[in-house]
């Protein structure tokens, strides 16, 4: 009998919750991927979305490595299987120095101090850098498991709230 892994159970719950938000008209799903990396024997699920009338995006990334998958399937003693969770927000900025300070305040207000939050700026060579892409990674420092399934709806509400707060900073046309 097939017994789904923690990764598979979390993926199904995330996917269902995100598509429910899409169906209700709160967001629009713009991309989805479910990958198996044969070189590292890992799995990654990602779903990207934006507000219905927005341009900023949020991407939920759920991943599990070989040790997590094997530890769970082979029932290794002392194994602590689970999944890594990251949420990545992306937007285009003008005047990044001032905007990033404000965005950092917004992110800390919404997400507290629990996850690590890193903003990475990039721009095309030859442009002056006044307009750049900001990728904000919210990374949780511990693995998640089936015990956190009830928290998924609230986590997605946080992503929608974050998108609303970031949208005024987005200058992408």
Task: State where each predicted segment sits.
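Short, charged/polar micro-motifs that form catalytic or ligand-binding hotspots
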Residues: 1-5, 93, 142-145
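Short amphipathic alpha-helical segments
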Residues: 2, 6-10, 99-103, 151, ...
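N-terminal interaction modules that seed assembly of large macromolecular complexes
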Residues: 16, 20-75
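Short, solvent-exposed secondary-structure capping/transition elements
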Residues: 23, 27, 96-100, 168, ...
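Broad gene-expression machinery/nucleic-acid interaction feature
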Residues: 42-46, 57-59, 82-88, 135-137
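Short, internal acidic amphipathic alpha-helical interface segments
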Residues: 66-130
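Glycine-rich, aromatic-bearing surface loops/beta-hairpins
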Residues: 104-173
